[in-house]
Amino acid sequence: MSETIVSMENICKSFPGVKALDHVHFELRSGEVMALLGENGAGKSTSINMMVGLLKPTSGNILFNGKDSSYLDEKEIGICPQDVVLWNNLTCFENLYMIGKMYDIPKKLLKERILKILEKLHLTDKKDELISSLSGGMKRRMNIAMATIHNPSIVVLDEPSEGLDPQSRRLLWDYILHQKELGHTVILTTHLMDEADMLSDRVAIIDHGKLLKLDTPKKLKQIIGNGDTVQLELDNHKDNEGIISELKTIGDLNNIFESDEKIILVLLDAVKKLPDIIHLVESKGSKIADISIRQNTLEDVFIELTGRQLRE
């Protein structure tokens, strides 16, 4: 099991008239990407602001490698805020150089690192361009470059792809996964289902200041909600009634019914059970003309836990 590097222990945070976090407890493991998934105001940004020392908890403890957060070396953490924070009157290279010098990175190493980061973020041709001339997507990529120029072991990203077009989002995702390849630990906040699903080793679903569930995306989709939907069409529709009766023995079956001469099954972890379903149908002498499956999604999980959809 990976080493725990950050522990949020029974954290509460209150503002006048609002309880932003309500007894939140989770651990961040070395080398993982964790997503905090929830709506605006759910408590995601409050959580990471406390992790990096920008806010103090009302109660509870935050530990880094088992020690109080006051022992945290600021060079070990990189923060990419939701708002773009760049010097518009400087070039891309100059922005990164200024930040690098603040972290006392040696001049030769800093220049090499800047060029590598710009290449990774597809910004090499913008090296000598003023920030003010960049598109919104390019500024977002520069924002994360500024947060990682000092090679931090922990990278904190607050809604990193907010408002990005699909191409810029993919470039940013590739860079986030590159941070994991380097052995860095990443925690990000998001309200985008596909972002949490694609990037995260684990997802924490937060709503109204409470941690509702924390697990891998795969496990969350396997165990929460009504499950996957399997649609079976038999060669002979007259077999449907008998096959439905037999399929009721399948484990974790939440529903089964006939619709438009097709058999519809709703069950958890259907992909794993698909061979058993096919074998059972064929063992009864029936033939499958067509089969399709719609897998449970993180959106389904979120709706099941909160009772509403998450905005996209």
Feature annotation, model-predicted:
Residues V155-D158:
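Catalytic Walker B motif of ABC-type/P-loop ATPase nucleotide-binding domains
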Residues Y97, K101, K108-K126:
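Conserved ABC ATPase "signature" region
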Residues G60-D73:
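Conserved ABC transporter NBD signature motif
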Residues D174-L268:
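ABC transporter nucleotide-binding domain
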Residues V52:
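Helix-to-loop junction immediately C-terminal to a conserved catalytic motif
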Residues L130-L134:
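Conserved ABC ATPase signature
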